[in-house]
Amino acid sequence: MGYDSQVRTKKRHRITVVCTNCKKRKSKCDRTKPCGTCVRLGDVDSCVYLTDSSGQPESSPSLNDADPLRKQSTPAERISPGFIKKRRSSQTRQDEDHWQRVRELENQSSLYYLPIHEETPFFIDLIPSGFYLETKRSADNLFGLFTDRAIENRDPYLQTMVTFRSIAIKKMMDKLGSNGNNVKNGSLPKSFEALSTFDADDERHISDDVVDKGNNFRMHQTIHKSLFNKFAQYRENNAKKFSSETILAKDYLPPLKILESEVLALFEEKIYNMIPIFDMKILRHEITIFYQNIVEKGNPVSIKHYDHMVFCIILLIIKICRLSVQFSKLTPYIYPVLQEIDTSKFLALVKHYLFETKVLRKCNLLQLQCLILLRFLHWCAPEDGDGPETQYCQILMGTIISSCKEMGINWYCFSHPEKYSFKINRHTRPSYDIMKPSDYISVFRKIWSYVLFWDRKMCFISGEECQIGKTLQCHFKEEADTPTWYIRMLTLDNLMKKINDTLNDDPGKVDLNLLHRLINDLKRNFHILKSLSKNEKETMRHFDFEMEWIIDLFSLSLLHGEMIFYEYDCNITKFYKSFQDLWDMVIHISEKCYNYFFNSDALEVDSLTKFYTNRIVEIVANKVLVIVPAFILRGDRFKTIQYADKKKMIEFLYGVSSVYFNEFGFEYYRCFRKMFTAKIAYKILNRSCEKNAWRIILKFLLNELKLEDNGDSYIDYNDMRLKDICPIILEFQETVQKYDGYRPDILSIWNNEFYPIGKYNDDMTGFKFQMRIKEMQEFLDMEKYSDRFNIFSSFYDHASSQLAKHTEVDTNISITNEQVAETPQKELLQQPLAPALPVNDLIVSEFDVIEDIFDPVDFVSFF
């Protein structure tokens, strides 16, 4: 088929007898100018009639026409929701050229052809180990496909390492507890007990070391205690209880003049576009009424008249604005009054008032706006609102979505706005004299587009299924001045929903080729949208920044799942390619993180919006820390990855960890608590050439299974058994037991028999792993924290010297049952089967391994 035949025939620009708005809405038009319907809906400026046949297309083509097999759209889908905007009175030649280029891009994106191998479905399994569900005292969670837990559960190397780590920590806790060294902090969760206990034991060791008594130790002790106290205070403040009768609004709020001049001015200028769910004129009116009736007169906050919801909205806006200034790292002389406001009890006050209403039964506009502000605060705040893996956000988000649907905030406010018939009662707040039906439609549109995008966003971040199950196909218009960035993103919603459906309809059978096509379409169409927003470039950069990072994060998580599938499937060529692609993606994302922290001016992100952008950067950087150990543990399987290359990977892990925890660990509770396991993972992997970490892990867990079978395991009868927690080790044990009295090296069994992809030589495919040393260099030469306290490596010199002594002694010991290979890649194929050790000897042996890796001295302040 020739190119000319592929181009869509342009329609004639016919003269219309009704205005273009009514034609698109399919509503009645009285044919006046402006028509009555447009006057009623506030679309006066865009009420136009076509009177010539200029040959221009009647409407811009849909971004979603790339799918040639899609069904005929319904009338609702043919409507252009939310994009009937004010038309400029005239356009310059430059603008006409710009829109011509946009049309060309759209036509190209809707008519491209794919290679036949990309059109053919190719299915992969993203849940080879099943879904990951965790139950505990306070919550039950099914983790999304791309959360840390799900990634670790999918990857046999990470799953085994995490299991080993948890058992080792438990054994060390039991050992320290037997000495009466357990430490508890009532304001911190039970999961912090191990952190506090390790830390207290380390302080006892170091306080006895004369060498370490000095400024460094005192500085460490001060910083460490302040962090524990700060995060304990977070939880204590958020758990505070109030009595409605004793709450006086004036005790928490600044004077109205300061609120308007500093807080609301900052909110409207810098933050409102992030959460555009208000009509600011109406909001200011409600705040003024609240101050007049409650603050100035000293009246109690009325729940009946919904004063408490206005109060909560004010509290949340103040707290969000304060976060904006706090994380901007600007001089304290900017917004000084705002920084002096004590917001520590605000979240507890909001939660108190929210549950004074029937929040689980019915909802009004103020209450919904309060819930959305709370959701936004959970996302941005340093407290642990969403959970360490965003696993606690769905319940609040589900409440918001259900409330929206109950209130009529849905796709209809875009597709059929003229069909809304309001009855506004006299006691409604905001009242009818300040908020008319057209204002409701406008606010409804803002809220729905915002809630919709956040629902789709969480699918890309954690892989969880979208809660909003409907989408409409939206079209570009020739004007870029849509009310909000979120409304503009409606043109991408159909693609984002398709990606969600492809991923979550059957995670065990995901069409990878279709997913790649959809992601490429999303990137291309998002690029077009960015070109349309050229007039708002200054105020929208943080949104575009976040969207780009979200797409990168999704691609990273998908690549990891793809690599695991090829590994299980023994697809050698594709496994090697995905292994390299995943590593390249890790390096690329790490570079972006580095630039965010140390070259932020080049990113052109407003410093007052960093409290918002920090969150996506923190999630992405953490994902790198989760995935990098998977490369290090697999390194021995590749002929082209030498021990020196593994050391570079470990140095890279150390560099990324240092940046992540030094930039976020001091402020964010969720990052602080991850430091413990991250430090242990680093200690596990940072082994000498003679001490292969993967061999240690496998032997340890096989011994633990033997102890479990003999009834001598440390595991309490209420705990799950190792064979249930990590079934792959039980399967591996069965494979090892096939060798009766004579067996190969344990790594040979794993690589060649149990996990057979390892038996294929790199020479068979010509694979040569590219380390990308040049791109890693910033993290290998980690000097950013050499002149100040490095929270990740505190007292690391002392710990390293202790570890070096152990290594030196172990290296000089004559090994009779196992010969040490010259390099990790050269494995012994056969060796005598070592006799089984007595149970007591096994326990001693295990503690030797644990103490070698987890010497408490290594965890001064690493909890």
Swiss-Prot record:
GO annotation (BP), single: positive regulation of transcription by RNA polymerase II
Keyword Metal-binding: yes
Pfam family, one: Zn_clus
Function noted in UniProt: Transcriptional inhibitor with a significantly increased number of target genes in response to oleate.
Family listed: Belongs to the OAF3 family.
Alphabetic keyword roster: Cytoplasm, DNA-binding, Metal-binding, Mitochondrion, Nucleus, Repressor, Transcription, Transcription regulation, Zinc
Residue ranges: DNA binding: 19-47
CDD domains for this protein: GAL4
Taxonomy, superkingdom: Eukaryota
Protein name (database record): Oleate activated transcription factor 3
Signal peptide: none
